[in-house]
Regions:
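Internal helix-loop-helix
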Residues: 46-118, 159-165
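Short Ser/Thr-interspersed hydrophobic loop/turn segments at strand-loop and sheet-helix junctions
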Residues: 48, 71-76, 169-170, 188-195, ...
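Structural signature of FAD isoalloxazine-binding scaffolds in flavoprotein oxidoreductases
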Residues: 62-74, 133-137, 220, 224-226
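A short, Trp-centered hydrophobic/proline-enriched beta-strand micro-motif
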Residues: 117-125, 169
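Glycine-rich phosphate/pyrophosphate-binding beta-alpha loops
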Residues: 130-131, 155-160, 211
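Flexible, small-/acidic-enriched active-site or ligand-binding loops
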Residues: 136, 193-225
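A structural signal for short hydrophobic beta-strand segments in well-ordered beta-sheet cores
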Residues: 139-142
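A short core secondary-structure module
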Residues: 151-201
Length: 228
């Protein structure tokens, strides 16, 4: 395919943003082993970069994935790996399933403010005993009245110390015979009124060999209640 004028305009604006708003601060963020996710994501959201392929009804641009690829190529000009990885978690890991399958109510609560950059998100799949073996995860969400009650832990969570909510994979049918069919994605608030949500503990921020500017965490969940 050939890039259109619209593709080129997106590329130019994204490259300018990278050079003006990100690269001048990369060395500082790498040294501090964290970057100001809320501040940067809000700027990205104001430019429309967090919702390029997301539905227009929730504030996205409603464009096809070729535009997402152009944006990601521009973000590759960031002079570190941690920041573009963190942005990618927000745009391409924690929100796509929500945009496709989420109810209008839950999309308004989580997707819309993630597109505007008012919320920072993370993806919760890997666990201490289940890294690449996703079927072996132990975190479970048990129905109790109108809620799920979640217990377990998640490991190597990008954006983990700063995220406002998590797109979590959990076992929702503990007695199911097929461990590949007993799981659900659940939007789990990690903060309430600016404070850590009840039952959620950021156990530790992990030290890494690279990707230093991206905060990576281990997170515990102890009887965390989430509406079904």
């Amino acid at each position: 395919m050939e890039l259109t004028t619209e593709h080129e305009e997106l590329k130019r604006s994204a490259l300018k943003f990278v050079e003006d708003e990100i690269n001048p601060y990369v060395d500082e963020w790498e040294e501090n082993e964290i970057f100001p996710a809320h501040e940067l994501f809000k700027k990205l959201g104001d430019q429309g970069f967090l919702g390029v392929t997301k539905p227009e009804k929730y504030g996205g641009s409603g464009l096809d994935y070729s535009y997402g690829a152009v944006l990601n190529e521009a973000l590759a000009h960031i002079k570190c790996g941690g920041v573009p990885m963190a942005i990618g978690v927000q745009t391409d890991m924690s929100t796509p399933a929500l945009a496709r399958f989420g109810s209008e109510e839950i999309c308004n609560e989580f997707l819309k403010p993630s597109i505007t950059g008012d919320l920072v998100s993370c993806l919760g799949v890997s666990e201490p005993s289940a890294g690449s073996d996703v079927a072996a995860i132990k975190t479970h969400a048990v129905k109790d009245g109108d809620d799920y009650v979640i217990n377990g832990s998640k490991m190597w969570i990008t954006n983990g110390t700063q995220a406002d909510w998590m797109c979590m994979l959990a076992n929702t049918e503990t007695d199911h015979k097929n461990k590949h069919l007993n799981k659900s994605l659940i939007c789990v608030p990690l903060k309430e009124n600016g404070k850590r949500a009840k039952g959620v503990t950021i156990n530790r921020k992990l030290k890494k060999m690279g990707m230093h500017s991206s905060d990576t965490a281990e997170i515990f969940f102890d009887d965390v209640r989430v509406p079904q």
